[in-house]
């Protein structure tokens, strides 16, 4: 499985990290002609992709983030509505662990929930610098992201593959389990997306993954009893071990 690094030059975080990646590690990232959420990755020759990107946050939280793509509801930023992209759980967790190893003081490292486009049929993971212009343009952040991308295989996650249902957009509980080697996470469905979460989307969370998940974590506090029982049954019917946490 060849993993290709890509970036959009109109994104200062992505451009800076791509330049650092080539300068420091001799890895040349592929330049995209448009912003990644709207790009058709199925047209590229690579097997899987790491997408260098900026991350925006109204709360101005300084962070390095990792997430998969897809839309549980409307397609407000690329992709198709109610369709998920293809996750790559071990790659995402490995990147997160590498980010954690090299992160700067004052910066968080976290999984984000699955969101925005593209809804590609090829596995891809967004690796991001957040969350405002000064962070995106900071050369020290470019160095951290470049080093994490260059060394992700040295931080490879061999833990069971999993999905997560519930909780906030920034999934600290999933992040903790990845960093501790308990599980590598693919798609994460946050609490705000639960109104859209039907059996088809639950199936996509499991089947739209390069590595099929064998486990699911369901946050008890996020789901009312009736919904929780329905979600647990659907995931068990898909063959997953379900942990209510």
Curated annotation (Swiss-Prot):
Pfam families: tRNA_deacylase. It comes from the Archaea. One of its GO terms (molecular function) is D-aminoacyl-tRNA deacylase activity. It is an enzyme of class 3 (hydrolase). Its EC number is 3.1.1.96. Binds 2 Zn(2+) ions per subunit. Its cofactor is Zn(2+). GO terms for biological process: D-amino acid catabolic process. Keywords: Hydrolase, Metal-binding, Zinc. It catalyses: a D-aminoacyl-tRNA + H2O = a tRNA + a D-alpha-amino acid + H(+); glycyl-tRNA(Ala) + H2O = tRNA(Ala) + glycine + H(+). D-aminoacyl-tRNA deacylase with broad substrate specificity. By recycling D-aminoacyl-tRNA to D-amino acids and free tRNA molecules, this enzyme counteracts the toxicity associated with the formation of D-aminoacyl-tRNA entities in vivo. Monomer. Belongs to the DtdA deacylase family. This is D-aminoacyl-tRNA deacylase. It comes from Ignicoccus hospitalis (strain KIN4/I / DSM 18386 / JCM 14125). The lineage of its organism: Archaea, Thermoproteota, Thermoprotei, Desulfurococcales, Desulfurococcaceae.
């Amino acid at each position: 499985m060849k993993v290709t690094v890509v970036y959009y030059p109109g994104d200062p975080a992505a451009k800076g990290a791509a330049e650092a990646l080539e300068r420091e590690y001799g890895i040349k990232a592929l330049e995209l002609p448009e912003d990644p959420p709207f790009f058709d990755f199925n047209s590229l020759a690579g097997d899987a992709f790491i997408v260098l990107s900026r991350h925006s946050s109204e709360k101005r939280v300084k962070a390095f983030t990792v997430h998969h793509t897809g839309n549980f509801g409307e397609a407000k930023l690329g992709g198709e509505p109610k369709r998920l992209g293809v996750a790559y759980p071990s790659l995402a967790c490995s990147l997160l662990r590498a980010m954690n190893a090299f992160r700067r003081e004052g910066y968080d490292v976290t999984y984000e929930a699955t969101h925005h486009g593209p809804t590609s049929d090829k596995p891809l993971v967004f690796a991001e610098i957040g969350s405002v212009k000064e962070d995106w343009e900071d050369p020290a952040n470019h160095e951290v992201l470049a080093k994490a991308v260059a060394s992700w295989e040295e931080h490879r996650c061999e833990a069971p593959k999993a999905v997560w249902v519930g909780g906030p957009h920034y999934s600290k509980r999933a992040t903790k389990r990845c960093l501790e080697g308990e599980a590598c996470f693919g798609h994460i469905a946050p609490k705000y997306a639960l109104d859209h979460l039907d059996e088809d989307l639950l199936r996509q969370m499991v089947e739209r993954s390069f590595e099929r998940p064998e486990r699911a974590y369901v946050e008890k506090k996020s789901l009312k009893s009736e919904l929780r029982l329905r979600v647990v049954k659907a995931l068990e019917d898909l063959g997953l071990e379900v942990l209510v946490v």
